[in-house]
Design a protein with these regions (language model features):
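PRPP-dependent phosphoribosyltransferase catalytic core
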Residues: 126-165, 307-378
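Conserved Lys-Pro-Asp/Glu-containing loop-to-beta segment of HAD-superfamily phosphomonoesterases
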Residues: 71-93, 292-295
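Substrate-recognition element of Asp-dependent hydrolases with the DxDx(T/V) motif
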Residues: 13, 22-52, 58-65, 212
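A short, structured active-site edge motif that brings together acidic residues
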Residues: 54-69, 212-216, 244-257
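Active-site-facing substrate-recognition patch
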Residues: 135-210, 219-221, 253-285
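Metal-dependent phosphoesterase signature
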Residues: 1-20
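PRPP/pyrophosphate-binding module of the type I phosphoribosyltransferase fold
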Residues: 12-14, 262-352
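Acidic, Mg2+-coordinating phosphoryl-transfer loop and its flanking beta/alpha structural elements
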Residues: 88-125
């Protein structure tokens, strides 16, 4: 169950009059038995009772709400994670309440507040707010797949085999691209469920996390990845610290590699064509050390991308790596133990790495998670 928190400022159209569309959206969400509260440091505004008459929207005066303690107390009382709270954000106080309370912040797109505008999840209007809430509310709150190898972890939001026999990585990748490029409610819901899954696993905000994207096989797409924008938005949702610059990718593809999802490149468990065509960005040689790194990819089958990324990051001194795929095909995921014998921030020759072994990477699955993704990436 999700709860939606807003403040008087986030729904006001003028200084004394709330936006009727936003009010109706909140009432509609609340009347479907979802907790909705207007939270403020100040007493209940004069317009509240009339605006929310005959609805289940409640007003809560929480002095010092910026500390986020209000969210933590309610979460504890009802035995629910703080990541189940969506906080509509239009002011600095809203931002602080949500961040300190370890909730999911959703920017009110009609606000000019700088902190709100910096958030990765933004709704443009009342209709989009409802859509994001409803799509996200269908998500059971966990990864579809969770697996851990001796040297890195793999997470996936959904089982892509459930798309049908004709599904493949190319078509799903295009679906993800379309969803991200089109923006709107589906993108924001996709960001929200990914953020919730991370925060649930972490038990709240985690410090020292570095976010990156596994690069395209095409070197001309230098940081022009659809997933780059998705990852930037995700980072701003679950973390307050930015270790990577939006304009500087973590990995650099210096030479084109075979498009494995299109059947190119032969043995899809052989890392040679990947290891020898990319390297880490030297700009991060110092900042990557000791960090827990999250690598985002659209989908995975054999898991080779994550194995290669883990090898480079281990050589660079990263503390850990978790690969997150929006989807996973089949049951052929493997763990790759790869060691680099050269500088991970420069091109690596085939003679400068060793594939020690690759073995099956088992994990746990949560069946209920996959259906929700079909709504977000149709």
């Amino acid at each position: 169950m999700l709860a939606l928190l807003a403040s008087p400022s986030s729904i006001l159209k003028t200084a004394t009059k709330p936006d009727t569309d936003i009010v109706e959206a909140l009432k509609d969400i609340a009347n479907k038995n979802n907790p909705v509260a207007i939270v403020s440091n100040n007493p209940k505004p004069n317009w509240f009772d009339e605006a929310f008459n005959l609805s289940k929207v409640v007003f809560v005066r929480a002095k010092g709400r910026q500390s986020g303690q209000f969210i933590k107390d309610v979460a504890k009382k009802h035995n629910m994670p703080t990541s189940n709270f969506l906080c509509l954000t239009a002011t600095d106080e809203d931002y602080m309440m949500g961040k300190n309370g370890q909730a999911i912040l959703i920017a009110a797109g009609w606000s000019n507040n700088a902190k709100a505008k910096s958030l990765g999840i933004q709704v443009a209007n009342a209709s989009e707010l409802k859509e994001v809430f409803e799509l996200t509310n269908n998500w059971p709150g966990s990864w579809w797949f969770t697996g851990n190898s001796p040297s890195y972890g793999v997470r996936a939001l959904a089982d892509l085999s459930s798309y049908g026999a004709g599904a493949d990585q190319v078509s799903f990748s295009q679906k993800v691209t379309n969803t991200v490029k089109q923006g709107g409610g589906r993108l924001n819901a996709l960001l929200t469920i990914t953020s919730r899954s991370l925060l649930l696993e972490w038990g709240g905000e985690k410090k020292g996390v570095f976010f990156g994207v596994y690069p395209s096989s095409d070197p001309t797409k230098f940081n022009d990845e659809v997933l780059t924008d998705f990852t930037h938005r995700l980072r701003t949702t679950v973390s307050r610290v930015r270790y990577a610059d939006r304009s500087e990718p973590l990995f650099i593809r210096h030479t084109a590699s075979p498009k494995r999802s299109k059947g190119q490149g032969g043995d899809r468990t052989d890392p040679t064509s990947q290891v020898t065509t990319l390297h880490l960005n030297p700009s991060y040689a110092q900042s990557i050390r000791g960090k827990d790194v999250i690598i985002i990819d659209d989908c995975t089958t054999y898991g080779l991308s994550f194995g290669v990324a883990a090898a480079f990051l281990a050589a660079a001194g990263a503390s850990s790596m978790t690969g997150i795929a929006l989807g996973k095909f089949g049951s052929r995921l493997e763990h790759y133990h790869i060691t680099l014998n050269s500088d991970p921030f420069a091109p690596v020759k085939a003679s400068d790495f060793t594939l020690v072994e690759h073995t099956s990477l088992p994990g746990k699955t949560a069946v209920g998670a996959q259906n929700a993704l079909h709504e977000l990436v149709p």
